[in-house]
Amino acid sequence: MSAQAELSREENVYMAKLAEQAERYEEMVEFMEKVAKTVDSEELTVEERNLLSVAYKNVIGARRASWRIISSIEQKEESRGNEDRVTLIKDYRGKIETELTKICDGILKLLESHLVPSSTAPESKVFYLKMKGDYYRYLAEFKTGAERKDAAENTMVAYKAAQDIALAELPPTHPIRLGLALNFSVFYYEILNSPDRACNLAKQAFDEAISELDTLSEESYKDSTLIMQLLRDNLTLWTSDISEDTAEEIREAPKRDSSEGQ
């Protein structure tokens, strides 16, 4: 569709909404990337920012789910000693990992070149730095060796930069600050294998938000309380020291991003 290149910013946003309704998330990503690349000197609107986030979360989410399922089957076949099947599964897993890498590289490049440099408001800075941390974390989920180490280090740098701004500039009940705490704590638990630090971060974020619950604005009440519930769910899970299946039940910021309505 050569006509797509000629669409205005507003038309690309509309097409992205259309693609979302049709659950055609790859195309939704394409439309929102065009919007993001046209705004070098100004920020995306909150609506545009959320559309971009939702598009990428759905595209990456489908592959992350596929990877987990295939990895689980691979472990079962390995334990049964089915080497031929394991070889087939490894190749198939590699295909999914190639897709995951391409998706993460795409959004990380966009964040580096356009979105982070053009952000001026504390809220959008935290949003994009959190997003940067999220996609490096997704790389760390399946990469190995030096690549995993690099992805984990980049995750930490991005989340830490986001946290510094969030703690200084956003209230404890702000959905973006809460969503950051949620995903940062998941990073500590899943990638760094630091359950104590994960629990401390999640508990502090939850407690600080609870103490200021009466200051919550009506429009962000639903988003904030949802993320607080997810923080509490993870704390319950992590502190009860459950079986190996724990990781699959861990909650992250929801697909409709933690900043919606802000």
UniProtKB/Swiss-Prot annotation:
Induction comment from the UniProt entry of this chain: By wounding, drought and salt stresses, benzothiadiazole (BTH), ethephon, hydrogen peroxide, abscisic acid (ABA) and incompatible and compatible races of rice blast fungus (M.grisea) and rice bacterial blight (X.oryzae).
Pfam (any one): 14-3-3
Superkingdom in the source lineage: Eukaryota
Tissue specificity statement from the Swiss-Prot or TrEMBL entry: Expressed in seedlings and roots.
One CC-aspect GO term: cytoplasm
SMART domains named among the record's database cross-references: 14_3_3
Subcellular location: Cytoplasm; Nucleus
GO biological process, one term: protein localization
PROSITE patterns in the record: 1433_1, 1433_2
Chief location category: cytoplasm
Keyword annotations: Cytoplasm, Nucleus
UniProt similarity note: Belongs to the 14-3-3 family.
Function, in words: Is associated with a DNA binding complex that binds to the G box, a well-characterized cis-acting DNA regulatory element found in plant genes.
Complex formation: May form a complex with the transcriptional activator VP1 and the bZIP transcription factor EMBP1.
Identification of the protein by name: 14-3-3-like protein GF14-B
